Amino acid sequence: AICGHEWSGTLSAVGSEVKSFSEGDRVVVAVAPACGQCAPCRAGQADRCFVSFMSALGRDAMAPKHGGFAPRIAVSASRIVKTNPALSDIQAAQVEPTTVAFHAVRRSGIRLGDIAVVQGAGPIGLGAMQWVKAAGAGVVIVIEPNEQRRAIALELGAHYAVAPGAAADELVKE
């Protein structure tokens, strides 16, 4: 299998039963849909769906054989979302991690003026940092071991970006 997630593409064909997409549509991958039947789904925690998780691991019938690094893949219509055709491939590929970051911040219950600590300044961490700022966090602290990523976090509006360790622990305690 060829790996790859956080991809975008253009549909080269659609199945005869598919009515919501057309050949030529620009799409991005979505997280596998929740089944609605397993224990987490019944408890209102669709983000922890067993079926969705197994699909993400390539272990069910809905999972594509190959990922986004393959030149062509077959994907269930339930796993894709139309995107703005004006977005570049790089921009469109950020839809999934941005959505993950948004969901995490929404679940956090952050309120206006809160202090937010974001662990990591990769794509999802930087997205979460921007979402907590948009949600009204008063102070945003990013903890990241990579100096270049810390610099990016500061450029994007973090109040502090520090390496993990005693200094980070002290800053968070303040």
Specify the residue positions occupied by each region the protein language model found.
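Phosphate-binding beta-alpha-beta segment of Rossmann-like dinucleotide-binding domains, i.e.
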Residues: V31-A70, I90-Q91
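Glycine-rich beta-strand-centered segment in the early N-terminal region that forms part
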Residues: A1-R42, N84-L87
